[in-house]
Amino acid sequence: MSQLTHINAAGEAHMVDVSGKAETVREARAEAYVEMQATTLAMIIDGSHHKGDVFATARIAGIQAAKRTWELIPLCHPLMLSKVEVNLQAQPEHNRVRIESLCRLTGKTGVEMEALTAASVAALTIYDMCKAVQKDMVIGPVRLLAKSGGKSGDFKVGECHD
């Protein structure tokens, strides 16, 4: 079983030392959903929401959040991301918005937290912009879809990993 890398031998939280690691291309994808009433989703789709373009705002928020993950998650390293992508898709058949984020860099540590943060903050931004018309929206699930690069190997949802 894998060890918790952010806990030292004394059981204390610490930042992992990545100075000895090789730089490799690392990438991660994550997703989040925001469930809402059909009327709320229709306002987003047709652009009639009084706060403006919900998807554009959520996309920018997700990108900004990925770049600032190290300020939000205590033991994350500040990273020089080379790519952050946030895509939003209305799914009227399910009364929800699907958000998928992608983060990439060449570096010594992974970008899973950055991808998860991007998707999460984009979802929170949708909630913030739409809460005046609906307060009972549901955010989730939020999950890592895939990661590649690094010592721990690749991961993809649905593949068995021990």
Curated annotation (Swiss-Prot):
It catalyses: (8S)-3',8-cyclo-7,8-dihydroguanosine 5'-triphosphate = cyclic pyranopterin phosphate + diphosphate. Substrate binds at residues 75-77, 113-114. The active site is at 128. InterPro entries: MoaC, MoaC_bact/euk, MoaC_sf, MoCo_biosynth_MoaA/MoaC, Mopterin_CF_biosynth-C_dom. SUPFAM superfamilies: Molybdenum cofactor biosynthesis protein C, MoaC. One of its GO terms (biological process) is Mo-molybdopterin cofactor biosynthetic process. Keywords: Lyase, Molybdenum cofactor biosynthesis. Pathway: Cofactor biosynthesis; molybdopterin biosynthesis. Its EC number is 4.6.1.17. The keyword Metal-binding does not apply. One of its GO terms (molecular function) is cyclic pyranopterin monophosphate synthase activity. The keyword Lyase applies. PANTHER family: MOLYBDOPTERIN COFACTOR SYNTHESIS PROTEIN A. Catalyzes the conversion of (8S)-3',8-cyclo-7,8-dihydroguanosine 5'-triphosphate to cyclic pyranopterin monophosphate (cPMP). Homohexamer; trimer of dimers. Belongs to the MoaC family. This is Cyclic pyranopterin monophosphate synthase. It comes from Klebsiella pneumoniae subsp. pneumoniae (strain ATCC 700721 / MGH 78578). The gene is moaC.
